[in-house]
């Protein structure tokens, strides 16, 4: 492919040198990309279909034995490994007379191999690393007995290089840095390796260089043809180039190979002789560096797969130079479009993190990676987790967080070490949802491109940001529905439905009409008292990861005192059934007599809790076979409750937001919060004992969904255009309006103004705690287990406050009811479908 033109723009670099048009290659070779935008190539790129097919043919056509044997099959494996090793060196233009290549698991394993060898030297070593280093490079500092230093800038590095003339031969030094930052794609000078060597040798010093090339080689050629200018040690991961196999390499400049002579550990295949009885002695292999370092049996099947990877990559893309040109063009286009996005008030949407000297037009200074965060029109940060959740719903995949680049991330975001220690004490952890702390983001969003990225990927991301995060003046008015005046007649509302979710994240048990249901401090009776836990990790399973959990439907049979559980679609004729006792002490039933429980620590929404796990193989098999994951049932009884919901949320933020859209004076000034806000006990619920939603709000949301679909002119009958059922919100209580006169005008989102509710003939009081933050789990159809993009997509446009998508309200028994209940143990509060609901509003005295 020579080049194409699109929209009048000459883009000769797009797919230049490829075997065919990029879109044709994608359709044939990357079926896993169908309906998906994948922009996390810095993590791993994707493997081609023909690569897997070629490797499969290789495996089924040849007999490969363990390379450490002398059989014909073993010798075939040895020959193939040797051939692939040479091919890998040539891929990086490394002369085998000057370099050796050691196969390892990944780049991190290669770094550790070098650091371990230097640690084992008699005098130890000093270690220096660049602030943009990957976490694995930073970790090597712990092995440096002579000290270490983090260079916070290129200027510091170059100043240190100048001082190498004063270094003596007694000092063993290692300087490590990334060829390309995995955070933002900034490329560092490869010339440092040659300069360091020249100055160190001139002073009789002993300084070596380690280049982390893992990020660079994913889309760019690495030329090691000049051995005098090359790093002493180069580390990389092949899966970042080809997607498969999962394999890494350490390329050693042979003149630096003596560093490994003091290495203490030895494994099978790296020695010529070992004595173990009369004396302890061994002789290391001397034939090559890789013979001394590749401990144990090589992953020879993966190495053989690498042969197919080289061939497939060359056939499809021609060369790494072609990939570099292709991705450079797309990265420049993406960067320019993101940088140009503005809100209606002129404020920029994207905060882009780049080096001042980087240029997306120049391969020497910048790779195809873009790091950024989003702001709203008022300059407030939009949480990275919220963006990633919505992107997942839209089938867009990228990475967020600190990206295993602690120095680069903290520097870009303005965090000092003292700041981060303070935030760590406050609960900040790698991979958590603490998106913004002390007014600053804790991580970034990263888009990274690969050989098979196309223009459609770029356009999809831009359209995604424009649709959901660019604020336009015309759209603001529809963001919040004005609250109608509250009519005098009461009641206006009633309980339309009551739902209990006995097993966390599984299907609902709908309380029958006419049945009064007990409500406790922890919520509705039997609600979220059980959960499914992974038998390996102890983590609680949820529908976000396992959508089929929606098809696990518990039934609370009070007459028989059992929880009856069925699996499968409602229309299925072969549903499986399991019963467990509701009574923890009841062992009379056969189904529970074998359900012995053992205490097991589990993680629920970040909390460590102790649950009682059913150890019966039949229970585990029932759930494991249906979900396809090793799990079992566990219980968290009310009497052992040790979890608490967050304190009642101050409503000020929500009120301030609403003030922009309703009449002045609708709300009084916020009162001062209590110094010790009450916290409600919960079982396995996420945040509160009770979750309620409004039928009117669901109806209004569906109107918005339909309007959005018409606006986009989507094909009629597509799954995404259907109205959503109230069930997707997994509420305990659905409140509906009762109309006594015409016209019937609903009041959507009136629940945003509720302070408390009085329910039923006994006026049971519930306190409304705050808005319920939503995630992509609402996109799972609770009747089929199928994931869609609604209602989350529409909620993201119409129900967002401070970057959080909300729908429904958290609630709990009022403290007065709890106190009364504790003093009179014979009285139990109950609810029933049809009970009247009388709300009090935040602006009522």
Curated annotation (Swiss-Prot):
Annotated InterPro entries: Aminotrans_V_dom, MoCF_Sase_C, MoCo_sulfurase, MOCOS_middle, PyrdxlP-dep_Trfase, PyrdxlP-dep_Trfase_major, PyrdxlP-dep_Trfase_small
Keywords: Molybdenum cofactor biosynthesis, Pyridoxal phosphate, Transferase
Enzyme class, UniProt record, top EC level: transferase
Pfam families on file: Aminotran_5, MOSC, MOSC_N
One GO MF term: molybdenum ion binding
Lineage start: Eukaryota, Fungi, Dikarya, Ascomycota, Pezizomycotina
Keyword Hydrolase: no
Gene3D superfamilies, A to Z: Aspartate Aminotransferase, domain 1, Type I PLP-dependent aspartate aminotransferase-like (Major domain)
Descriptive protein name: Molybdenum cofactor sulfurase
MOSC domain ranges (all copies): 666-840
Similarity remark: Belongs to the class-V pyridoxal-phosphate-dependent aminotransferase family. MOCOS subfamily.
Modified residues (N6-(pyridoxal phosphate)lysine): 240
Gene Ontology BP terms: Mo-molybdopterin cofactor biosynthetic process
């Amino acid at each position: 492919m020579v080049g194409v033109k699109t929209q009048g723009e000459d883009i000769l670099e797009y797919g230049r040198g490829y075997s065919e048009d990029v879109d044709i290659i994608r359709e044939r070779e990357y079926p896993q990309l169908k309906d998906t935008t994948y922009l996390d190539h810095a993590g791993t790129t994707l493997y081609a279909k023909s690569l897997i097919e070629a490797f499969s043919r290789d495996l089924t056509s040849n007999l490969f034995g363990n390379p450490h044997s002398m059989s014909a099959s073993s010798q075939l494996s040895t020959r193939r490994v040797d051939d692939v090793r040479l091919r890998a060196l040539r891929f990086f233009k490394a002369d085998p007379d000057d370099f050796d290549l050691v196969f390892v698991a990944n780049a991190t394993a290669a770094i550790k191999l070098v650091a371990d060898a230097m640690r084992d030297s008699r005098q130890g070593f000093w270690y220096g690393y660049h602030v943009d280093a990957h976490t694995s490079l930073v970790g090597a500092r712990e092995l440096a007995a002579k000290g270490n230093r983090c260079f916070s800038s290129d200027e510091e590095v170059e100043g240190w290089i100048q001082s190498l003339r004063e270094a003596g031969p007694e000092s063993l030094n290692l300087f490590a840095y990334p060829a390309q930052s995995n955070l933002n794609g900034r490329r560092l000078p490869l010339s440092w390796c040659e300069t360091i060597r020249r100055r160190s040798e001139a002073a009789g010093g002993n300084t070596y260089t380690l280049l982390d090339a893992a990020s660079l080689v994913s889309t760019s050629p690495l030329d090691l043809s000049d051995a005098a200018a090359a790093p002493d040690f180069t580390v990389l991961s092949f899966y970042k180039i080809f997607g498969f196999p999962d394999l890494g390499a350490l390329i050693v400049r042979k003149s630096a190979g003596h560093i490994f002579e003091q290495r203490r550990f030895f494994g099978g295949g790296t020695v010529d002789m070992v004595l173990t009885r009369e004396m302890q002695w061994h002789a290391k292999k001397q034939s090559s560096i890789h013979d001394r370092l590749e401990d144990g049996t090589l992953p020879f099947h993966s190495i053989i797969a690498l042969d197919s990877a080289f061939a497939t990559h060359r056939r499809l893309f021609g060369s790494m130079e072609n990939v570099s040109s292709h991705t450079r063009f797309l990265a420049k286009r993406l960067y320019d479009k993101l940088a140009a996005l503005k809100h209606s008030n002129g404020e920029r949407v994207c905060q882009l993190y780049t080096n001042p000297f980087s240029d997306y037009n120049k391969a020497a200074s910048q790779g195809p990676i873009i790091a950024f965060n989003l702001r709203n029109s008022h300059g407030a940060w939009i949480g990275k987790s919220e963006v990633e959740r919505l992107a997942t719903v839209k089938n867009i995949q990228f990475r967020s967080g600190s990206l295993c680049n602690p120095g680069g991330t903290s520097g870009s975001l303005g965090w000092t070490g003292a700041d981060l220690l303070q935030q760590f004490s406050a609960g900040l952890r790698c991979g958590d949802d603490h998106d913004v702390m002390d007014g600053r983001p804790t991580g970034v969003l990263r888009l990274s491109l690969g050989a098979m990225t196309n223009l459609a990927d770029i356009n999809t991301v831009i359209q995604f940001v424009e649709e959901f995060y660019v604020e336009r003046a015309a759209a603001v008015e529809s963001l919040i529905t004005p609250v109608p005046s509250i009519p005098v007649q009461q009641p206006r509302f009633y309980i339309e439905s009551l739902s209990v979710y006995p097993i966390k994240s599984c299907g609902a048990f709908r309380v029958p009409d006419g049945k009064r249901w007990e409500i406790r401090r922890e919520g509705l009776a039997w609600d979220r008292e059980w959960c499914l836990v992974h038998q390996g990790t102890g983590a609680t399973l949820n529908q976000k990861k396992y959508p089929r959990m929606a098809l696990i439907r518990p039934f609370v049979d009070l007459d028989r005192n059992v929880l009856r559980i069925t699996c499968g679609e409602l229309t299925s004729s072969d549903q499986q059934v399991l019963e467990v006792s509701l009574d923890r002490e009841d062992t009379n039933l056969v189904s529970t007599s074998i359900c012995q429980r053992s205490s097991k620590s589990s993680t629920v929404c970040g909390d460590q809790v102790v649950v009682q796990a059913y150890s019966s193989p039949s229970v585990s098999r029932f759930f494991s076979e249906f979900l396809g994951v090793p799990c079992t049932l566990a219980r968290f009884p009310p009497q052992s409750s040790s979890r608490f919901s967050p304190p009642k949320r101050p409503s000020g933020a929500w009120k301030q937001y609403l003030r922009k859209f309703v009449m002045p004076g609708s709300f009084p000034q916020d009162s001062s919060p209590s110094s010790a806000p009450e916290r409600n006990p919960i079982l396995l619920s996420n945040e509160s004992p009770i979750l309620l939603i409004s039928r009117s709000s669901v109806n209004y949301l569906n109107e918005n969904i339909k309007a959005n679909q018409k606006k986009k002119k989507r094909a009629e009958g597509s799954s995404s255009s259907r109205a959503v059922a109230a069930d997707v919100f997994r509420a305990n209580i659905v409140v509906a309006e009762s109309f006594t006169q015409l016209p019937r005008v609903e009041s959507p989102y009136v629940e945003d103004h509720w302070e408390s509710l009085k329910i039923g003939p006994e006026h049971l009081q519930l306190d409304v705690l705050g808005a319920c933050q939503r995630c992509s789990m609402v996109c799972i159809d609770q009747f089929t287990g199928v994931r869609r993009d609604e209602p989350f997509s529409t909620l993201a446009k119409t129900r967002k406050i401070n970057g959080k998508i909300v729908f429904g309200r958290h609630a709990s028994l009022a403290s007065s009811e709890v106190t009364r209940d504790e003093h009179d143990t014979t009285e139990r509060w109950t609810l029933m479908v049809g009970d009247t609901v009388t709300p009090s509003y935040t602006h009522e005295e």
